[in-house]
Amino acid sequence: MSCENPSVDKDALMARRPKFDKTKQCVKCKERTGNVVIRHAVYCKSCFFPLISTRFRKSLEPSVNPTPDGPRRKALKASGSLLVGLSGGLGSTVMLDLVAKTYFGAPSVADLGEEAPPSKPKGGKEHPRNMTGKDSEIWRGVPAVCYVEVCGAFPGAEDRTERVRQVVESYATTSPPFAFDFIPLRLEDAFDLEWWKGVGELLFTPPPSSTPILALQAYLSSLPTQTAIHSATQTLVRLLLLYTAASRRASHVLLGTSLTSLSVNLISGIAQGAGFSVAEEAMEEWRGEGKSGELTPPIRIVRPLRDVGMKECAIWAWWCGLRIVGRERYLGGTQGIGSLTRNFITGLERDYPATVSTIARTCAKLTPKEGSDGVCLLCQRPAQHGVQEWKSRTSIRSYNHASFSSSGHERPPHLANATDRPQHRTEPSPSSHLTPHLCYACHTTLTSRSSRGNVKQTSDSKVVPLPLWVGASLSLVPTSEDSSGEVWATRRMGDGEMKAAIGDLLLNDS
Amino acid sequence: MAPQTCAICQKAKAMVKRPKTGEQICRECFFYVFETEVHNTITQANLFKPGDRVAIGASGGKDSTVLAYVMKMLNERYQYGLELFLLSIDEGITGYRDDSLETVKRNQQQYDMPLKILSYDELYGWTMDAIVSQVGRKNNCTFCGVFRRQALDRGAAMLNVDHIVTGHNADDIAETVLMNIMRGDIARLGRCTSICTQGEDTIRRSKPFKYAYEKEIVMYAYFKKLDYFSTECIYSPDAYRGHARVFLKDLEAARPSAIIDIIHSGEAFEVREEVKATQRVQQVCQRCGYMSSNALCKACTLLEGLERGMANSGITDRARKKLDAEGPAPDNLRTIPFFKPPSGGPLIAIESVS
C-alpha cells in the first residue's frame, strides 16, 4: 500500500522531466539500449556514428561541385584542391577525422568498433571512398591541413605546432595510410613579406619595419578593446588560411565550426555590427588576388559540422579515441564580447538544448538588405556603403563633419557666438583614407573604445603595421577623384602615408 | 591633473563621459548631440509632415517623459509644425500606474499638451488587477502586452491623430533583435528595427529614440531635472527577456558601442524573399475590426477566454481546444468596440490644459 500523503500538492511530487524521451532504447534501430542522449533523443553507439557522418556529408557535399546539380554521390568532383583548417580544438579535430574516414580511406568507425568489418564495401562500389585511381579523387591533388599558431600574439602561450603535426601525421600510420600535407603557419605571417611573396603579388614595398612578430604585436596592441583583439585574431587566421588555400589552387576550405560555435559566432558577430555578413558566417565564397594580380577562382569556405553540436563532437572524439591538442582560446578575457557570448550561449544550450539550432536556423533565413558595393580591405567580406554617414548621424562626434554642416543644423547655444569653430585634428583627404574601405564591423573593431579604460597601448609605435593584404589591396583601390577608373599600379607606401591612411584610427596619439 | 576639455567643442570643461561613445564632453554638447541625433533620426526617416497630429505614448517613466520634452523642443526648434498630444494607458494596476499617471498629468501642464488617458477597464471591461486575480502571475504579461498595443491604437483613433511616437530606446531595440534571433521569430525580427511601422488600418507608430541609449536618456532627464517615476511592474517580469537584458548589459560594459552595433546589424539584414512568402498575410479581426493574423485578433481571443472563465485558452493550444469543445462564443459575450481608423475630427472629448 502506498504511504503517499494525500494532502501534499501533486505538483510538488512530480518527477523532473527525464533527460530523454519515453524509452531507453535507441530511437533509430529500436533494438539496442541507448548510450547517448542528444536533444532528448536516445541513440546507441552503433547508430551514433552514421548519424554524425550523415549530417557531416549533408552539410558538405551539396557545395562540393561547382554547380550543385545531378546525383551528388556519384559525381562529386570539386574544381580544385582541399584545405582543412585545424585549430587543435575539438571541432576541427573531429572534422579532420570525419574527412579522413569519409573521403580518404582511413579505417571507419565500424572497423574500429566491436563489429566485424563488412564483407561488402560500405556504401557500395560507387561510393567515392571505395573507388580507386583517378575516379576516387573528389578534390585535386593532395589535401592539406593548415594550422595557424597564435602563440606569437599572446606572450606565454604554448607553441602547439609539433603536437598538432603529430595529430595530422597519425593518419599516415593507419591502415590504409593516408598522408595529408601539413602546412604550419604562424599568426605573424600576416606581416611577413616572405610568406606574402609565396601567396600574393608584391605591388608595394611595406615600410622597413621590425620583425613580423613585433609588427603583429604592434598591430594587436594598437586595438582599443579586448574584444577587438579577439576578432582581429580571428580575421587574421581566416585570411591566412584563405590566401594559403588560393596559393594551392584550393576550391574548398573546411573549418570545424560546430553548431554551438556557429551560434556563438553569429551572435557575437551581430553584437559587433557584422549583421551585413551574417550569411557568410555559415557559408561563404571568397576570391582573392593571386600572385599575378588577377582574381583567383572562388574558394568555398564550408563548415561541415554546422549541424553537429559540441556535445556530439565530444562524444565522437571520446569513442574514436581522438587526441585533442587544445587551442589557445583567446576570447578577449572575461570582458570580451567573444567570451561573454560563449558563456551566454553555452549556458542557454544547457537549459534549452534547442536554442543553438534555433539561432543558426534563424540566421540562415537572413540575407543582406542591399547589394554590396565593395569588399572590406581588412576582412575581405562584402562591405555596405554609407556606413560612415550612418555612424556620424547616430553618434555625433564633431560639429565639423560634412553631414552635420550640410544638414542645416544650428550651432549649439554655447557656441553660437563663438567666431572660431572648434579645432579638430585635420582629417586626411578621403581618398587616402583607409576608413571608406572598411566594413562596419572592422571599422568598429579598430575604433570603438571600452568604457573601462583602454587596453595597454605601446607608446613608441607611431605607425601601426597592417596585414600585408590590406596594403596590397589599398594600392589597388581607385581614388575617389579618379573618375576614369584608372587603377594605381605600383606605389610605395611610406611611413607618413601609412600614418595618414589610418590617422583616424590611431588612438595612441591622444 | 588639469580638467579635460570637451572632446566635441574643445572649449568647455568636460562634465560627462558619454555612454554611447565613451567621449568626455561638456553638458551643453551632451544636450545638443542628444537632441540632434533624435532630430537626425526623425528627418532621415521623414517621419512627419507639417500639420501632422502626433500622440506621444506617455507612461510617466523616463523614456516617455524625456520624449515628450524633446519632441516639444524639436518641434519648436526645427519648425516641424506638429500638433502634439499625450496619450496614456491605465492598465489598472494598483500602486503601479497611479503615481506615474500623476507625472503625465504634470507633463500635460508643463508642456501645454492635451492629454487622453484610456483605461483597460474602459476598453476591455477588465483591469490588470482583475486579470491577474483570474490567470495568476504567470502569463499575465501576455494579456498586458496585447491589450496595451491595441489600446494605444484605439486611443490614437479617438484623438484622431496620424501618428503615435513611443519611447522605445536603443537598448530595447537591441534586446529585441537578440531575443527574436534566439526565439526564431522571423516575422518580428524582420520588422523590429524599422523606425516606423504601419498596418493597413492602423496608425503609424515610430520610435524617435531608436538610437538613444537608455543611460543617456536617464542622464538627460537628470541634467534637465525632469522628474519621472521609475517603478517596476509589480507583476512578474518576463524571465526570458530578463536573460537577454542581462546579456546586453554585459555586452555594453565590454564595449559601449555594442548596443548601436546590434541595431546596425539588425538594419543590415532582412528575411529572405522565399521565407517571407511563407509568412501569414495580415487580415482584419472578424469581431473587432483590428488588424490580425487570424480570424480573431489576439486581444479578442484573450478577452473571450477571460469572459468565459478559461483565461488560458489564449495561451495554450490545449486550453484553446477545450474552449472550442464547449461550443461557439455566446451572443451576449462582452467584446471590444469595433475599431474605426481615424477620420475627420476627434471622436472623443480630450482633456485640455486647464
From Swiss-Prot, chain B:
SUPFAM superfamilies: Adenine nucleotide alpha hydrolases-like
Enzyme Commission code(s) on record: 2.7.7.-
GO CC field: cytosol; cytosolic tRNA wobble base thiouridylase complex; mitochondrion
Biological process, per Gene Ontology: protein urmylation; tRNA thio-modification; tRNA wobble position uridine thiolation; tRNA wobble uridine modification
NCBIfam families given in the database record: TIGR00269 family protein
InterPro entries with a match to the protein in the record: CTU1-like_ATP-bd, CTU1_C, Ncs6/Tuc1/Ctu1, Rossmann-like_a/b/a_fold, TilS/TtcA_N, tRNA_thiolation_TtcA_Ctu1
CDD domains (UniProt xref): CTU1-like
Biochemical pathway: tRNA modification; 5-methoxycarbonylmethyl-2-thiouridine-tRNA biosynthesis
Assigned protein family: Belongs to the TtcA family. CTU1/NCS6/ATPBD3 subfamily.
Keywords annotated in UniProt: Cytoplasm, RNA-binding, Transferase, tRNA processing, tRNA-binding
Organism (species): Laccaria bicolor (strain S238N-H82 / ATCC MYA-4686)
Location in the cell: Cytoplasm
Main location: cytoplasm
Taxonomic superkingdom: Eukaryota
Functional description taken from the UniProt entry: Plays a central role in 2-thiolation of mcm(5)S(2)U at tRNA wobble positions of tRNA(Lys), tRNA(Glu) and tRNA(Gln). Directly binds tRNAs and probably acts by catalyzing adenylation of tRNAs, an intermediate required for 2-thiolation. It is unclear whether it acts as a sulfurtransferase that transfers sulfur from thiocarboxylated URM1 onto the uridine of tRNAs at wobble position. Prior mcm(5) tRNA modification by the elongator complex is required for 2-thiolation. May also be involved in protein urmylation.
One function term, GO molecular function aspect: nucleotidyltransferase activity
Protein name: Cytoplasmic tRNA 2-thiolation protein 1
